[in-house]
A protein has these predicted regions:
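Short, well-ordered beta-strand micro-motif
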Residues: 39, 109-113, 131-134
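Acidic, metal-coordinating catalytic segment for phosphate/diphosphate chemistry
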Residues: 2-36
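Conserved Nudix-box catalytic region and its N-terminal flanking loop in Nudix hydrolases
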Residues: 41-81
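Active-site-adjacent beta-strand/loop module that shapes the phosphate/pyrophosphate-binding cleft
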Residues: 96-119, 146, 153, 157
Length: 163
């Protein structure tokens, strides 16, 4: 079950900040890099988040900061967005161009099977809802890309180059 929050003003503010950040990154960086964690438990469930600033259900994740490794960013983002601690080595599923953000954004998707849930993720200004969902009963608004990555991982098919 996922916890919910709904604050229209906060959602608008975060959307504006997200857009401003992408404009800034476009001019200040040659490329942006993000990570996503495909957190799969032994019960056949995946952890998904619904952000306050963009529609649909996604894997938890975010940007790699200057001076940070991708695995450090993944560890930080999973702790922040999912309250999940990685206890074993994540496996890189693929590196993708994410055209939804810009022509400069790349995403590293990691499969995380060894983890510990620190606490139930509560809604905040960034995450409206979060939780584990059975793979055969994903939320209706789970994004196309999220469903595609799950299909690739579960079937063993190689990932495409574009998110």
């Amino acid at each position: 079950m996922a916890a919910k929050v709904n604050d229209g003003r906060e959602t608008l503010r975060l959307r504006v900040l997200k857009r401003a950040a992408h404009v800034y990154w476009r001019f200040s960086r040659g490329m942006t890099l993000g990570v996503r964690g495909v957190v799969l438990d032994d019960g056949g469930r995946v952890f998904l988040v619904r952000h306050t600033y963009t529609p649909g259900w996604h894997f938890p994740g975010g940007g790699v900061e200057v001076g940070e490794t991708a695995l450090t960013a993944l560890t930080r983002e999973l702790a922040e967005e999912a309250r999940v601690e990685i206890t074993g080595g994540p496996v890189l599923h693929g590196i993708f161009l994410n055209r939804a953000a810009s022509q400069r954004d790349h995403v590293l998707a990691y499969v995380v099977r060894d983890f510990r849930v620190l606490e139930v993720k509560r809604p905040d200004g960034e995450i409206a809802e979060a939780g584990f969902f059975p793979l055969d009963r994903l939320p209706e608004t789970t994004t196309r890309a999220t469903r595609a990555r799950l299909d690739e991982i579960l079937s063993g098919r190689p990932p495409p180059p574009v998110w």
